[in-house]
Amino acid sequence: MRRAIRSIAALCACACKPNAVKRAIGAIPARFRCREDQAMTTPNAENEALAKQCDAVADAAQGAIEWIAEAGDVVREEGPALARDFRREGLRARKLANAARRPMCVSVFGPSQQGKSYLIASLARKEGKPTTIRFGEELRGFNRDINPDGGKESTGLVTRFTTRPVNGLPGMPVVCRMLSETDIVKIMANAFMEDFDRDTVIPLDSAVIEASLAKARAKAAPAAVGRLNEDDLYDLFEYFERYFLNHPTHLALKPGAWREIESLAPRLSIADRVELYGLLWNNTPTMTATALKLVQALAQLDFPEEACCPMLAVEPKAQSIIDVETMSHLGKGDGDPVPVATRAGRRAELPRAVLTAVVAELQLQLEDKPFDFFDYTDLLDFPGARGREKYNAAKAEEVAQSDLFMLLRRGKVAYLYQRYLAEQELTSMLLCLKHSNQEVRTVPAMVRNWIDGTHGATPEARKGQDVALFLVLTMFDMEFEIKGGAEDNVERWSTRLKTTIFEFLGLGHDWPSEWVPGQPFNNTFWLRNPEVLNKGLLDYDANGREISFRDPGRVALLKGNFLANPDVQKHFADPERAWEAGMELNDGGIGYLSEKLRPVCNPALKRRQVQGQLGDLAKRMAGRLEGYHVSGDLDAELAKRRAEARLVGRQLLACAEAQAFGLLLRELQVQGETLAELFRRQQLAAAETPSAVTAPVGRKTTARELRSEFEALFEDDPAPTAPVEEAEEGPRDQADLFAEAAVAEWLQNIHRFAARNDSPELFRMDREAIATLVAQLAAGARRLKLRENIATRMRTEAAYNESMANRLLKPVMIAERAINDFVTWMGFDRMPVEARPKAGREGRSIFVRPPAPADDMPRLSETPIAYDAAFYVDWAVAFVRLVEDNVRGAGGAMVDEKSNARLGSLLNGLRKVAV
């Protein structure tokens, strides 16, 4: 204690001397230092500055939502889609702020049983000493007392090794990060959607979904009843949009149903909202009951982010919460109770199996610092990725009853990676792959998602960045086995790289072959475990330490072939050094790997990653708002937009070259089924609201017209005082209501398309180009009054009697045709041919059909005429003109100067971050 007081006094005395401060802090015993990620008493100034910048962008997103709500006459039908966009971006900015405040991490990841254990053990211990963990005043050996025994994959949570103090509560030194309610939902849904063959999934009928929603409506309170809010539910929706976009269960929940779930769930009791969540796993009873049990356990603690337990939670290690097998008791007694407490004072006793299921991370404080980079870096050990099953979904309840543990285990392991990826926790990754064929086919996509988020989705984006991905080829000594029929030649090494890189990581992904322009990925390392005896390769002393190779001649031959292999030269930055490191006695490659790891274990790397993503985020946000801001310099705005439009046009032609243009148009159009469901829900809502206007018949009549007719009776009388004219309000009849809803639904769909992660790769267009495309189509729809045109046509078409079936079908057909025609022709089909934009060197008018032969007999040439190519060019030219007309139209519009100034202020703030 005295030493601590002296050290703190020294710290105060040298507060103005940074280096002296560091020395003084280092002199304070670890157990007296505050926990960095909780108390934040000595935050890194740069990290905190970046976090505040992220917070400012999140605040700007909220400001944009408020502006959208006030500017309904400007954003019109696009308002709901824009508001959802900015809600998503605001959540993303908050996650980046949290990431900036947390320490950087090196993650060890890979499929199950890939030799990760030796790598973790070696990185987490000081040379020559066992890994020792501090729990308050007690010490435990990690391998001796905590880590489960056996050669099987054993963990079902993330293990964090840190040298920062991990301070629990009195008598409860075991500190855990907990799952949230929506985490539980994601895990259950992941288990169902990944482990049941989607071809056997029969989606829930719309009547079943509607019945569940109606039941929830009847039980919903007027306001939220707990911590859950609509942002949590929106984040849940975004999870399914990202990972299960085309799964039948997700598709069955049309956007309208999802929006109701977002609104209803926070206002329901736990039991009622978990029942509503059951729609995400096809109402499988056992899965719903298990989800309810886990959510209720979290509710006892008031849904904490962190909780503390006594040593009982990890001892004895055969029953520890770190051992995933402990979770196998779920539904089978659930195990003995374990006390759990939160820093807010909540306490509960949770069954051991339940506690194991709801813990996301176990935090372990290392007694000894293994490497100097642990001063600012934590080591994360992820449970091994597992292959997924293909159960018959028709037997979902039967499978859930008999195999609940494995379902939950696979779902949780997969989701934990996704959660930490979303939270930007994985600054660097050590990807471990062994020599045999890889069976966990989901790993390449998981790695690719991380690369896209941390380094960039293209070789150009990754250029100039520190490489934070380390490909670790484990079990190097297995390469020296003499295999029947296999020769010790150069091709031997291509076979190894084939199983890990070419036919696994590179299958469907181009980053291994081109990490940066013109250069393949080459941050590859060998790793060998000296603790596993290989007497066919090495000789050992009496203590089991390696002393020499048994056949140096063969080792030299294999090394020569390795160095001569062209694939090796591509994928190893320094093949000879990698070989020598892997063959180093009693080391196996750890020394070389840690040496290369040290430079990227730098807080500046994480800041660059977060700053890069924040800049992209701010740029996207500004891009979505710019179309609504009226610039004082119309010529400059026109030049800027014209340049953007031409860039999009070129990418549209690249999309056409990839034969994806037709699919792009389809994504930009609206589906008739979607509008039919929308119309059905609108009719149901109208039926439940006695005052609702339900008849889309005739034309809309305004109060102004009625007053005009009435006053005409009294033209000879003195003119009365002119009444104050009321502003025309929003939709007045069913035609207006449905037209507005249909256009809003279409706009939300194309905004969702622009936000999808797979869109750039599928359509050969970058994210900014797709966002511009969507924004300008929306602006064109407003300018050309697409909603009003649909409503007018509905009134015209419905102005005569017809069957009930046609009355229900026709509005959908009208809206679908109008929206999809707009996407196809952008309004230029209604323009006289001579007034249309010109395309091609010959200056032909766009979208002109070739003249029909006089005798109705087509003239066929020897080579087919490329009508599709002409259409692609016409569409790109039409888009450029659409953008120009949008700018000119905005320039002549009436402007609310106060609203426009507020929008300009938001844009200025975002542009500063986007630089």
Task: List each language-model region with its residue ranges.
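Active-site neighborhood of phospho(di)ester-bond hydrolases with catalytic His/Asp-centered motifs
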Residues: 472
